[in-house]
């Protein structure tokens, strides 16, 4: 059986501002089954942004686990991410999940990989999913050569990724923290 997959999630940080956005397309094999999915959410008292790429059911499992770790560690993003990956590596069920998370708060942006790794990317840009490389390239250029806000950079970068990646559409959800 084929799994649900394909998306673009992008987070851009500039100074005290961070924005995260994602497209809304969900595919099953080569068929679009939903065009307006919400893959970026606010967690822990609206203070953390999180987006997912990968198998939808697996991503929701990770969201729930990550949110419980945030509660346990009073919103401390890095500690919650490390705790989640520790569980991920030791739990047989979690190890089989096929999803990635992009998470950000006012001070840090992280990628939590399907291998149970926590990565802090360079340039204040997090990009995951099938269109992630396109969105990341666009965002990096705009971040370096314009004064646009993170939300504007995310919006335009997702549009570019949607033009190039068949698993990414033009229906976007964008959240910001200031």
From Swiss-Prot:
Keywords: Allosteric enzyme, Cytoplasm, Hydrolase, Metal-binding, Protease, Sodium, Threonine protease
Keyword Metal-binding: yes
EC supergroup of this enzyme: hydrolase
Gene Ontology CC entries for this record: HslUV protease complex; proteasome core complex
Annotated compartments: Cytoplasm
Positions annotated to bind Na(+): 162, 165, 168
GO MF annotation terms: metal ion binding; threonine-type endopeptidase activity
GO biological process: proteolysis involved in protein catabolic process
Activity regulation comment: Allosterically activated by HslU binding.
Catalytic activity: ATP-dependent cleavage of peptide bonds with broad specificity
Active site: 7
Main localization category: cytoplasm
Record-listed E.C. numbers: 3.4.25.2
Entry's family note: Belongs to the peptidase T1B family. HslV subfamily.
Subunit (UniProt): A double ring-shaped homohexamer of HslV is capped on each side by a ring-shaped HslU homohexamer. The assembly of the HslU/HslV complex is dependent on binding of ATP.
Function: Protease subunit of a proteasome-like degradation complex believed to be a general protein degrading machinery.
Protein name: ATP-dependent protease subunit HslV
Natural source organism: Leptothrix cholodnii (strain ATCC 51168 / LMG 8142 / SP-6) (Leptothrix discophora (strain SP-6))
Upper classification of the organism: Bacteria, Pseudomonadati, Pseudomonadota, Betaproteobacteria, Burkholderiales
């Amino acid at each position: 059986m084929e799994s649900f997959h394909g998306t673009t999630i992008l987070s851009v940080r500039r100074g005290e501002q961070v924005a995260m956005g994602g497209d809304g397309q969900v595919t099953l094999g080569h068929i679009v089954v939903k065009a307006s999915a919400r893959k970026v959410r606010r967690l822990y008292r609206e203070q953390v942004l999180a987006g997912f790429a990968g198998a939808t059911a697996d991503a929701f499992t990770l969201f729930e686990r990550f949110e419980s770790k945030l509660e346990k560690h009073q919103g401390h993003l890095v500690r919650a991410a490390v705790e989640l990956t520790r569980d991920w590596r030791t739990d047989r069920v979690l190890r089989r999940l096929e999803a990635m998370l992009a998470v950000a708060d006012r001070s840090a942006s992280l990628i939590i990989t399907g291998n149970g790794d926590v990565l802090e990317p360079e340039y204040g840009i997090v990009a995951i999913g099938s269109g992630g490389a396109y969105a990341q390239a666009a965002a990096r250029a705009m971040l370096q050569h314009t004064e646009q806000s993170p939300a504007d950079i995310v919006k335009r970068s997702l549009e570019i990724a949607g033009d190039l990646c068949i698993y990414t559409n033009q229906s976007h959800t964008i959240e910001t923290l200031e």
